[in-house]
Amino acid sequence: MRLFTYPTPDLIHIKLKVKIRIHPPLHISSTAGFDIIAYLLQIVQTAFKPLQMPSEIIGIRLCKGYFMSLHSDILVVGAGPAGLSFAAELAGSGLKVTLIERSPLTVLQNPPYDGREIALTHFSREIMQRLGMWDKIPENEIYPLRDAKVLNGRSDYQLHFPQPTEARGEPADCLGYLISNHNIRRAAYEVVSQLDNVSILTDTVVKEVKTSDNEAQVILENGKILTARLLLAADSRFSQTRRQLGISSDMHDYSRTMFVCRMKHTLSNQHTAYECFHYGRTIALLPLEEHLTNTVITVDTDKINSVQNLSPEELAASVKEQLKGRLGDMELVSSIHHYPLVGMIAKRFYGKRSALIGDAAVGMHPVTAHGFNLGLSSADILAKLILEAEQRGQDIGASSLLEKYSNKHMLHAHPLYHGTNMMLKLFTNETAPAKLLRGLVLRAGNNFPPLKKLITKQLTG
């Protein structure tokens, strides 16, 4: 290990090691331990500043490959599924990535059940398999989605998307897969936690972000400053990072609230998903096990008491009644979680030395259950462009690269987001003309093969 001797401003000669090894292994977070480490780094930087040494070579390597430096190649604000997936894409690249997450480490290691089931396309499965995430999810908690049906109002007429025979040019026996959100988050963290080139700062709040022609800068709430060649916002559809970057967005408050829970039932769901646009409230059914279904109830926000005030037995009975006994007797078997519904799409997905991924770029209405697919796709597109640029010795934060990413992701995200909103506007409109049109749309979907094929392709990825 190299030693450097250099006079400090007060002319006292000191010896400083560039690398500091700490035992036992630590996970970096904004704790007192990190404060001490950061202080040591500041001493090193002060001592070596006259030598004009690059800040990125002054850092701390912890056991198990964790590396923390005041300078990284890429800073990612948000260690949710999109941020973690992006970091996993850069495994073995040599690029130093630092993720900044306000949640504690225990939440990343063991995310709590939040009621949300994610519908994954075949393309998303391919990405997750390549990144090593798929194999970390218990096989018995990956649920195939065979069929999908859409109902309208009080009618029993169904728009039916049957079990496919192929997807993405390969044989397939399902439209996609359903996996609990907390299982995806856990798998993503397990992959990233083993990467030598990735650091995760937990319990850490970002106060401010700045970008210039040469670098991006993140100022933490504790006063510390981190820099990088590129900054990514992956901190939810309500992203403060996006706002500070000056990237505007179209945000739509649907004025509705979604309740999610698991229910057992006496009749088989036949691995079929239902979207029931009934009058008054919408029910979505996502099949897990044959007699276990994730139940999503959506009501106008001013009517949430009509759900919240029900006992578990009353809620199960009301769902059974609304489904006309389609799944037999119902029983609530999980906690109930509720979320206000807000959609968002950014005007563009990049800024100066910065880009948006995941929900910070596009926050979909959960009616599609496909929000994570978009987030995963955004991470995949951007990571591939960055890896290509790095291999060619090009600037990974160049505006031309980031604009290319933005255009490519927008090409898919824009029509999906606005198309979903148009559908929701129609199927939550209960005027007489809208009710008539809703029925006609379902029939057109069943009897116009090109349209059905297009929607099926979207479902399968």
Curated annotation (Swiss-Prot):
Going by the record, the broad EC class of this enzyme is oxidoreductase
Per its record, the protein catalyses:
a 2-(all-trans-polyprenyl)phenol + NADPH + O2 + H(+) = a 3-(all-trans-polyprenyl)benzene-1,2-diol + NADP(+) + H2O; a 5-methoxy-2-methyl-3-(all-trans-polyprenyl)benzene-1,4-diol + AH2 + O2 = a 3-demethylubiquinol + A + H2O
- For this UniProt record, give its keywords in alphabetical order, as a comma-separated list: FAD, Flavoprotein, Monooxygenase, Oxidoreductase, Ubiquinone biosynthesis
State the needed cofactors, names only: FAD
- UniProt pathway: Cofactor biosynthesis; ubiquinone biosynthesis
Recall the GO molecular function terms of this protein's record: 3-demethoxyubiquinol 3-hydroxylase activity; FAD binding
What EC number(s) is this enzyme filed under?
A: 1.14.13.-, 1.14.13.240, 1.14.99.60
Q: Which cysteines are joined by disulfide bonds?
A: none
Picking any one GO biological process from the record gives: ubiquinone biosynthetic process
- Record bears the keyword Flavoprotein: yes
Protein's job: Catalyzes the hydroxylation of three positions of the aromatic ring during ubiquinone biosynthesis.
Record-stated family: Belongs to the UbiH/COQ6 family.
What's the protein name?
Ubiquinone hydroxylase UbiM
The organism of origin for this protein: Neisseria meningitidis serogroup C / serotype 2a (strain ATCC 700532 / DSM 15464 / FAM18)
Q: What lineage does the source organism belong to? A: Bacteria, Pseudomonadati, Pseudomonadota, Betaproteobacteria, Neisseriales
